[in-house]
Amino acid sequence: MATCSSSLLVLPNLRLSSNQRRNFKVRAQISGENKKATSLEPVNNNGSVSLSTTVQNQKGANEVNGKGKSKRKIVSDEIELLWDDGYGSKSVKDYFAAAKEILKADGGPPRWFSPVDCGRPVEDAPTLLFLPGMDGTGMGLVPHHKALGKAFHVSCLHIPVLDRTPFEGLLKVVEDVLRQEQATRPNKPIYLVGDSFGGCLALAVAARNRSLDLVLILVNPATSFDRSPLQPLLPILEMVPEELHFTVPYALSFIMGDPIKMATLGIDNQLPTGVKIEKLRQRLTKTMLPLLSELGGIIPRETLLWKLKLLRSGCAYANSRIHAVQAEVLVLASGKDMMLPSQEEAKRLHGLLKNCSVRCFKDNGHTLLLEDSISLLTVIKGTGKYRRSWRYDLVSDFLPPSKGELAYALDEVLGFLRNAVGSVFFSTMEDGKIVKGLAGVPDKGPVLLVGYHMLMGLELGPMSEAFIKEKNILFRGMAHPVLYSDNDPAKAFDYGDWIKVFGAYPVTATNLFKLLDSKSHVLLFPGGAREALHNRGEQYKLIWPEQQEFVRMAARFGATIVPFGTVGEDDIAELVLDYNDLMKIPILNDYITEVTRDTKQFKLREESEGEVANQPLYLPGLIPKVPGRFYYLFGKPIETKGRPELVKDKEEANQVYLEVKAEVENSIAYLLKKREEDPYRSVLDRLNYSLTHTTATHVPSFEP
């Protein structure tokens, strides 16, 4: 028995004689009362592998039949808000330790293992199969094991150093597992994460198994190997003598990955700059560089030559059948990949594949999964790829954001805005008293938060942070369907993806129905994109539909409506070019017209009357100001429970609608007046306060 640093438990029973069958078992041990054992072992004399899984579940499996006949389990009932996803706790050092450990008993055919770090997934979790790159160890997901293990049954393919199974044989290894998984969990997707060479393997498998529900995640796929910058150097590698081979993997390591990015993984961004630099220096000199010299043991000379041959055959095989791929595909491409032209390949695959999305990481190298970036699970969530049946359900399949995701979003996504606007929150109690904080907002759902959409939706980030930190509530906000469009073959993982990580959903009546039915806190802006992209002179003006759109649905579920107002957009920027101004510029006119025409396919507000029906999408011209402050006021909650007349009587519902609208307008007027009394409205005053009050956790504001 050998236990490695990545908590992999290996139970080998290897007979290395060529005329005897080889057996190999790997077990994932899970703490807690309910344990699962996954046995993956060869069953054919030719060394191919099939999967046999036995799962003990005290509640019983509640498989979804794809037609909605059974009540689906809700992921957020099993995973708490701000859970620990473990990303950053393991680094490339752990990868090398795990790789060395698994190579100690490295005989036999290709096999599968389930890392113990993955733990116990949520109920009805789909399967994720990791197909490794050139190293073949299967340890390329080490930094992601804990996070992925919450959402998937994870199995990783290990190809022993001395194994010489051809590409077609590896296809059979994967297909045997797919067939067994399809028989065990017939109504669930199967995820194939293919790293580099594994990307060729995943595409080839998908082309040969078009009837299966597969989701491919291709990380710098080696389908572009024939166009690699290294092609002129490959003949030289074959002539390097054995005694000098140790230099080859060492040199390749600097081409395949970014050592600085690898060393940065796991260093806390909250640390002072000097401390971070010192930690990075120590990791580079004491950990990274010594570890790179060990690559020769992972990829010996004969193995390297075999892997290059395997890469050529895999690249040719996958490209010859790429037209047959029907699977859902997500390509992750690094901008600094020195081994493959990954960004160019991502564009090519986006054009060839029928259902392909792309996310580019411009600062990463070839070994993206081992470098400092974003958790793979975060990328899957942000691109809307996580589902547990044949289609995504925004309620039951939603994975709450983790502690690490919140920290990254606050520091790297909101960043300057969050610190500059110094947001202040007020709410109204049932007796009408206005208090600081969010105490007046009900804790139990369903709750419908209805308010004013500030310029470009700048109020969303600080508001989401306040609800999470003060009330431990994640509200679900609506997003324009254009954010779910993946037509850009060079798209980065950006703000639009992050709002999906934090619960945004496409704006449809059906989705609002589902969320209220699940007793969620739901954020609604009746003014939509038209209000967020308003013209000059329209700040703080409600551009709402003439007739109510939400009161009757709220009443159907007995939801509490909380109207709110926000102010502060005019304190951070001056709107100088609005839609009317931009349409007078010929080049911009053509661009905005084309974008607006493309968005009409979403058919938003087709039946609405008035100005709100006009929702052109554009970027307004802004001149920044010395930042002021954002203010939020949540009005007195309006109960709809026990008022069945609101469901049946449109006039009664419209009266409540007008009441909500008036309350939002009153909140805005109140904040505009009271902010004049705030001695710390300017960022300069708040900065001075923070410097003179080092123990203060929050800069004060006006008294309500």
UniProtKB/Swiss-Prot annotation:
One of its GO terms (molecular function) is diacylglycerol O-acyltransferase activity. Its main location: plastid. The keyword Chaperone does not apply. This is Phytyl ester synthase 1, chloroplastic. Mostly expressed in flowers (e.g. sepals, petals and stamen). It comes from Arabidopsis thaliana. Keywords: Acyltransferase, Chloroplast, Plastid, Stress response, Transferase, Transit peptide. Gene3D superfamilies: alpha/beta hydrolase. The keyword Transferase applies.
